[in-house]
């Protein structure tokens, strides 16, 4: 099963846009041109019969600009105030843009309790189902104005995690994270010229997690570990997930057309199918690695690394799970 076949099946889609995707880096103001293009893409998906849920960051940043704050809020109270001001302004812009296409939207603000409390979760699911049945586009954010990092429930902490939890809650088919990165690499590409881009992940294992969040890795500190954790939530719930760069908002169209944009994390169902397709090549690779480790004169680490970089096998990761840019 190729990527296009997989994506053609998708009907209920959650799309998360990060702050850097919808704002200007220089000023922190909303990028109205890009946001308008994003809305147009969503409308086109709706016209194709897709159900769309948006998870949008940006409330704190928009509120900070509106309040005339030059720097990020340092206290929790200041952050919550910025979120309260910014969320209303952000929704006003979304509503205005969607209204040009006569498309209704609904603001849905969630807390961790909305997901973890059984009764709240049930009500949240019912709300999403009813909104989608009514052809409304839900626009979701964490309720930062009241969310706190406390023991009973805590908070989501970031919208990648929120989007993954929403995907699980609504039984989404696909989660797209539009961020400030192209996708996942085997290493930090700015520091390692041998870093390989991973187009498809069929299994999230310890080796993959190590790539995303090694303690000394700049790559990990850039939020990749958070995205991998989000992928674990989404794929375990049956949704495929894609990380793509939001600089080109039209990448969403390319993704839905089945083009190899970003990194695709396959759900367990699709992952098993891909595992079977890759099994012969992986078995061959592992045999070669095993033989190399038996040879004399080189340390195991050096031998394995040397073999991994062999272009013939397009391999990465000490257990040889990257084949043809598929982990």
Could you tell me what each predicted segment is?
Residues 1-72, 76-104, 108-327:
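C-terminal catalytic "cap/lid" subdomain
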């Amino acid at each position: 099963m190729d990527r296009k076949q997989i994506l053609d099946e998708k009907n209920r889609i959650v799309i998360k846009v990060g702050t850097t995707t919808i704002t200007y880096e220089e000023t922190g103001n909303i990028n109205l041109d890009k946001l308008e293009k994003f809305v147009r893409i969503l409308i086109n998906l709706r016209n194709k019969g897709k159900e769309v849920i948006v998870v949008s960051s940006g409330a704190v940043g928009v509120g900070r600009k509106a309040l005339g704050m030059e720097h990020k809020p340092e206290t929790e109270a200041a952050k919550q105030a910025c979120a309260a001001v910014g969320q209303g302004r952000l929704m006003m812009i979304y509503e205005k843009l969607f209204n040009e296409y006569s498309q209704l939207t609904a603001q849905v603000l969630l807390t961790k309790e909305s997901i973890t409390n059984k009764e709240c979760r049930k009500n949240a699911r019912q709300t999403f189902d009813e909104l989608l049945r009514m052809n409304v586009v839900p626009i979701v954010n964490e309720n930062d104005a009241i969310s706190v990092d406390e023991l009973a429930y805590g908070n989501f902490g970031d919208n990648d995690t929120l989007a993954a939890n929403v995907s699980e809650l609504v039984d989404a088919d696909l989660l797209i994270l539009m961020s400030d990165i192209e996708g996942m690499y085997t290493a930090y590409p700015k520091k390692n010229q041998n870093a390989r881009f991973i187009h498809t992940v069929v299994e999230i294992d310890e080796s993959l997690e190590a790539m995303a969040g090694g303690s000394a890795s700049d790559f990990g500190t850039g939020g990749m570990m958070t995205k991998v954790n989000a992928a674990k939530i989404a794929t375990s719930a049956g949704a495929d997930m894609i990380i793509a760069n939001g600089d080109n908002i039209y990448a969403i169209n390319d993704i839905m057309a089945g083009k190899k944009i970003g990194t695709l994390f396959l759900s367990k169902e699709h992952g098993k199918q891909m595992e079977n397709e890759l099994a012969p090549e992986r078995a061959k690779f592992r045999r070669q690695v095993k033989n190399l480790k038996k040879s004399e004169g080189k340390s195991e680490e050096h031998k394995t690394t040397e073999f991994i970089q062999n272009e013939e096998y397009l391999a990465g990761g000490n257990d040889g799970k990257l084949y043809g840019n598929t982990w």
